[in-house]
């Protein structure tokens, strides 16, 4: 199948394995690329830029097909050394970068001068248009269905993708709830030129995830996700479990308009205690 996405990234199938923290390692990435899709290493999973350079080199040994690197620009009190991570990407011969999080405009000249094609993750049409304006080559349009961070607009792919098709000139892929051939057909029908899958790839044998987690994902129904961190406007879709239930109880205990720092502190305190209990 040929689309503008397969032509842009020189891949056989318009399927991208999106960057996922602690999942996007070379074993999974190479498997996806060798199968004709586009595998993506997650840069910030690697503790240092040197570790990223080593992971890129390892992946080159496992595939001669195109693969990319995800670089997420996260809001934090102290930014990771993004320039050094980008240097590792460039020196590693990477020609495709998936950006996410904050606006990547600051880093676009450095990436483009190295001949790198950039696909940016967006959860709205307005963000997609901004990505197009700053020179991104493509965008991944993430509907409200997506795992991880779906944004704050709550627009599902059935509405978001056709709107993106109406507005964008650059190619885009659909993301959010994508899992099989039906997903790809629907994405193409809505105007996308491929799809980005994340959670589905966690359930593969190459993903470095415990089999119990993989089985839980496979057995989960469409009713078993929850939205957490909404009061902080950092909404995250997660698979329901006891810890998620506790987080939601903590959120409910804080009245609307109350100090978000207090909510964050309570959530962090709970997760820290839960981690200590789990580790014994």
Predicted regions and their residues:
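Active-site entrance/lid segments in N-terminal catalytic domains of soluble metabolic enzymes
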Residues: 1-168
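Active-site metal-binding loops of divalent metal-dependent hydrolases
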Residues: 20, 177-178
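Solvent-exposed alpha-helix faces
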Residues: 57, 222-224, 276
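Conserved acidic functional residues
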Residues: 121, 176, 277
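Small-residue (primarily alanine) positions within well-ordered alpha-helices
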Residues: 128-131, 192, 274-275
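Conserved active-site-proximal phosphate/metal-binding subdomains
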Residues: 151-173, 179-272
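Single conserved hydrophobic/aromatic residue that forms the stacking wall/gate
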Residues: 270-280
């Amino acid at each position: 199948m040929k689309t503008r996405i397969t032509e842009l990234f020189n891949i056989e199938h318009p399927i991208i394995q999106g960057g996922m923290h602690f999942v996007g390692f070379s074993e999974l990435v190479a498997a996806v690329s060798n199968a004709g899709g586009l595998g993506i290493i997650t840069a910030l999973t690697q503790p240092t830029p040197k570790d990223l350079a080593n992971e890129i080199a390892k992946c080159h040994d496992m595939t001669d097909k195109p693969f990319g690197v995800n670089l997420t620009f996260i809001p934090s009190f102290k930014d990771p050394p993004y320039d050094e991570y980008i240097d590792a990407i460039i020196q590693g011969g990477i020609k495709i970068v998936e950006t996410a999080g904050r606006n990547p405009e600051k880093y676009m000249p450095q990436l483009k001068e190295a001949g790198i094609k950039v696909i940016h993750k967006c959860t709205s049409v307005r963000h997609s248009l901004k990505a197009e304006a700053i020179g991104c080559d493509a965008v991944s349009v993430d509907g409200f269905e997506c795992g991880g961070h779906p944004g704050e607009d709550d627009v599902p792919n059935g509405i978001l993708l056709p709107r993106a098709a109406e507005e964008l000139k650059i190619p885009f892929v659909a993301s959010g709830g994508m899992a099989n051939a039906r997903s790809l057909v629907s994405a193409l029908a809505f105007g996308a030129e491929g799809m980005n899958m994340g959670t589905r790839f966690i359930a593969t044998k190459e993903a470095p995830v415990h089999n119990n987690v993989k089985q839980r994902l496979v057995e989960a129904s469409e009713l078993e996700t929850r939205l957490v961190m909404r009061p902080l406007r950092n909404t995250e879709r997660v698979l329901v479990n006891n810890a998620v239930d506790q987080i939601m109880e903590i959120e409910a205990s804080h009245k609307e308009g109350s100090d978000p720092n207090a909510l964050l502190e309570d959530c962090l305190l709970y997760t820290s205690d839960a981690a200590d209990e789990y580790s014994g």
